[in-house]
């Protein structure tokens, strides 16, 4: 396989010598405008984009299917709904999403809290059901599957059934948006951290500033085994709906101590549940389903290292899922644990601005993850209504924004930032070169041998970069605050 991939890259390099590249550019005031043809040069005339030592194969573009996203698209006329789904999920559409993330129980973009079994003490899971999922999540997925029959799926919980937690409630901490007894906040640690974190501005310090001292899951063998069985029941229930789940992660953002559905875990608890219960249970009952360690949203390398350095844990999981602050330690983790597969698991959603700044931010994040070895990329909500408000009172961005009063939708600047990558980098592409900073550039070779260069200038001055294309260079002049894709197969 490695020999065959080398032949593809060599043949692409030889063929690149005679190629010219056409381009398409997006700015804040003008989206998706065709640009000039650019020819290859023997010499670099700008900052040279770094060739990567290991050109990893890209897997899939994904999105999460949430109730509030389903509610948003349902506000549109049938024809507009069909157009949205086609543009997002069709193999010849604009985003070509071919992987879905499924929330197991409610997340923060559910209508409200629910789980598949809220009967206390039901260790045999006799009352387990996915009735709530049939209202929105499953119909949403079915519409995507109709356009992309080969779509794959992975699942993760935000919160276990409330009776499996030490606080017997879905949040981790009390808040005006939930009914949790504030006295239970002491279970986490004495005093709460500053709740005004601003992920959108790329955190400069350590997150979280203080670690939970307690597993919020009840660490009793009956509960641990019942929860592992719960994953299997969820996989089976979705399989009965012809929705195959081939990978799971134990918990969304164990380091976000949330007022919405969540669950804090210690490193010891993570290892115990995954290595002693979840992985062996699924290996026995669902041998085709892989377990990844995720989703990681902390930049505390020592914490994640303490989990993966456990020999049983490292040998049990097949990969690692990272989002938000977790992306900051991607390279270090790959260096120390090269046998694992790394994926990005959730797009950074901002605070409901739906603006050009969000587009530039997402463009840079895709460059960072793919250029540093993440092999899948999952977006969060691809569609939301109005200000993108959750059931717990906070606002987020989406790629498509619905006006509930008018029954219309807008494709946001962030949508086009994603399109600059997703339309041109299919599954099986190799990421061969990358630069970051204010001029993020990514060079990919598709399975057919086509070169794709996705570049941006996020700064206020003109920039000149040189992307390596085989033995030659594509010299690119980038105007300030532009997003551009160059391809020798661009129509």
Give the residues covered by each predicted segment.
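Carbohydrate-binding surface patches
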Residues: 434-470, 481
């Amino acid at each position: 396989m490695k020999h065959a991939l080398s032949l593809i890259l060599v043949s692409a390099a030889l063929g690149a010598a005679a190629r010219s590249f056409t381009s398409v550019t997006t700015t804040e005031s003008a989206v998706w405008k065709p640009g000039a043809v650019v020819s290859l040069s023997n010499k670099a005339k700008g900052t040279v984009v770094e060739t990567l030592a290991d050109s990893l194969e890209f897997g899939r573009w994904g999105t999460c299917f949430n109730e509030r996203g389903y509610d948003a698209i349902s506000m549109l006329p049938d024809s507009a709904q069909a157009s949205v789904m086609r543009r997002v999920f069709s193999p010849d559409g604009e985003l070509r999403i071919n992987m879905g993330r499924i929330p197991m129980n409610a997340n923060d973009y559910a209508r409200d809290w629910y789980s598949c079994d809220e009967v206390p003490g039901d260790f045999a899971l006799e009352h387990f059901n996915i009735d709530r999922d049939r209202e929105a999540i499953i119909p949403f997925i079915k519409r995507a599957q109709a356009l992309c029959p080969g779509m794959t799926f992975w699942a993760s919980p935000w919160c276990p059934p409330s009776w499996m937690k030490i606080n017997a409630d879905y949040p981790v901490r009390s808040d005006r948006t939930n009914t949790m007894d504030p006295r239970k906040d002491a279970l986490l640690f004495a005093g709460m951290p500053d709740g005004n974190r601003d992920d959108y501005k790329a955190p400069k310090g350590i997150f979280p500033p203080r670690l939970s001292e307690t597993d919020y899951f009840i660490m009793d063998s009956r509960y641990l085994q019942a929860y592992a069985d719960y994953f299997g029941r969820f996989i089976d229930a979705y399989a009965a709906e012809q929705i195959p789940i081939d990978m799971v992660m134990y918990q969304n953002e164990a380091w976000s101590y949330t007022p919405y559905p969540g669950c804090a875990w210690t490193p010891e608890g993570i290892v115990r549940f995954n290595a002693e219960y979840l992985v062996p249970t699924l290996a026995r009952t669902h041998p085709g389903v892989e377990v990844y360690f995720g989703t990681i949203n902390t930049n505390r390398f020592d914490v994640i290292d303490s989990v993966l350095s456990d020999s049983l844990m490292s040998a049990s999981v097949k990969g690692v899922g990272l989002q938000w602050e977790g992306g900051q330690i991607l390279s270090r983790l790959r260096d120390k644990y090269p046998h694992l597969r790394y994926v990005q698991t959730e797009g950074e959603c901002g605070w409901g601005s739906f603006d050009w700044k969000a587009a530039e931010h997402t463009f840079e994040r895709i460059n960072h993850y793919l250029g540093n070895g993440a092999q899948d990329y999952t977006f969060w909500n691809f569609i939301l209504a109005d200000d993108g408000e959750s059931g717990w009172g906070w606002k987020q961005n989406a790629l498509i924004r619905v006006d509930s009063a008018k029954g219309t939708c807008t494709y946001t600047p962030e949508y086009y930032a994603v399109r600059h990558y997703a339309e041109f980098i299919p599954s099986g592409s190799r990421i061969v070169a990358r630069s970051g900073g204010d001029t993020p550039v990514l060079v990919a070779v598709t399975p057919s041998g086509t070169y794709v260069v996705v570049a941006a200038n996020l700064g206020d001055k003109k920039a000149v970069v040189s992307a390596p294309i085989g033995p030659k260079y594509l010299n690119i002049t980038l105007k300030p605050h532009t997003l551009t894709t160059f391809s020798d197969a661009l129509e």
